[in-house]
Amino acid sequence: MTNIRKSHPLIKIVNESFIDLPTPSNISAWWNFGSLLGVCLILQILTGLFLAMYYTSDTSTAFSSVTHICRDVNYGWIIRYMHANGASMFFICLFMHVGRGMYYGSYTFMETWNIGILLLLTVMATAFMGYVLPWGQMSFWGATVITNLLSAIPYIGTNLVEWIWGGFSVDKATLTRFFAFHFILPFIISALAAVHLLFLHETGSNNPSGISSDSDKIPFHPYYTIKDILGLLIMLMMLMMLVLFSPDLLGDPDNYTPANPLNTPPHIKPEWYFLFAYAILRSIPNKLGGVLALVLSIMILAIAPLLHTSNQRGMMFRPLSQCLFWLLVADLLTLTWIGGQPVEHPFIAIGQLASILYFSIILILMPVFGTIENQLLKW
């Protein structure tokens, strides 16, 4: 009799994805982030579900309902802060995961990579809409500023913005629809994640060396299940330290003031995980140009496979490209810092330089360095 996990139609899928999956024997901790993202998604859906039981998506009661959750609902405060800071952990894992893909050349799995970009965009959209829901000052003005960017689209821009708002300003209709989208999108993300895995398992995982690992594979369970659980425990420990010791560390104090359309906060800025893109947007004086740069800062990932000139897949044996990669990381951290600063003298120039450097590294320097390394290897 065959084992039920190998014969049952449903259990067989789980078995082939998480138990008997042939996995390269040399993948490092950088390959942990996929499973961590899955855990983050489940955590966000569960905490979000409990928050949705008490939240009201009406402009007159939204702010009060969030206060009510924190003050009066049993353990409401911990659910709310786990959800808010869980989003930060989600993005930390996302950035690490994408960075790993860039470093080790995982973008050569085209289908997996493109679905990953789609996932990144969907998660960003979900997080943005979630930030609007508490209906604090930064929620309201963030929604106003970011949705207003669409008005830069020629001809249809203004109509598009009013269509998204459901009126002539961010109001009750906007909040209600954002709540509806914020509720449904995580389930769409789950479906996309399943497709992401489906395509990944067609090719098998990449590994740090970038060389085919067909000759040296081990079963996913118990080796990588244990390794993933270690990563999970570290992440949960970091999350709970954030939630229990400094839950408002990554938030904006302005969001504890109820939304007021008549009073603009001095510095409108999004959550920390969007600051790099926000800095790129602000560094271009033209509205349409800024919006295009904002979109390109993420969509540039889609052409990563076309910009790959090296004969080697990953950067493990390419010291020049490694220097460039870490320069890119430093540049993104600089952009994140600039995005949170006011628009005044030194910061404007730094932001513009960092934005130029960001696009230069990806579009020009990386392909050039790849070609140089190919030539050096011929010596």
UniProtKB/Swiss-Prot annotation:
The chain crosses the membrane at residues 33-53, 77-98, 113-133, 178-198, 226-246, 288-308, 320-340, 347-367. Pfam families: Cytochrom_B_C (PF00032), Cytochrome_B (PF00033). Its cofactor is heme b. GO terms for cellular component: mitochondrial inner membrane; respiratory chain complex III. Heme b b566 binds at H97, H196. Gene3D superfamilies: Cytochrome Bc1 Complex, Chain C (1.20.810.10). One of its GO terms (molecular function) is ubiquinol-cytochrome-c reductase activity. CDD domains: cytochrome_b_C, Cytochrome_b_N. It is a multi-pass membrane protein. Changing Y54H: In strain: Isolate Nellis. GO terms for biological process: mitochondrial electron transport, ubiquinol to cytochrome c. Binds 2 heme b groups non-covalently. Heme b b562 binds at H83, H182. InterPro entries: Cyt_b/b6_C, Cyt_b/b6_C_sf, Cyt_b/b6_N, Cytb/b6-like_sf, Cytochrome_b, Cytochrome_b_C_euk/bac, Cytochrome_b_N_euk/bac, Di-haem_cyt_TM. Its main location: mitochondrion. Component of the ubiquinol-cytochrome c reductase complex (complex III or cytochrome b-c1 complex) that is part of the mitochondrial respiratory chain. The b-c1 complex mediates electron transfer from ubiquinol to cytochrome c. Contributes to the generation of a proton gradient across the mitochondrial membrane that is then used for ATP synthesis. Belongs to the cytochrome b family. Heme 1 (or BL or b562) is low-potential and absorbs at about 562 nm, and heme 2 (or BH or b566) is high-potential and absorbs at about 566 nm. The cytochrome bc1 complex contains 11 subunits: 3 respiratory subunits (MT-CYB, CYC1 and UQCRFS1), 2 core proteins (UQCRC1 and UQCRC2) and 6 low-molecular weight proteins (UQCRH/QCR6, UQCRB/QCR7, UQCRQ/QCR8, UQCR10/QCR9, UQCR11/QCR10 and a cleavage product of UQCRFS1). This cytochrome bc1 complex then forms a dimer. This is Cytochrome b. It comes from Herpestes javanicus.
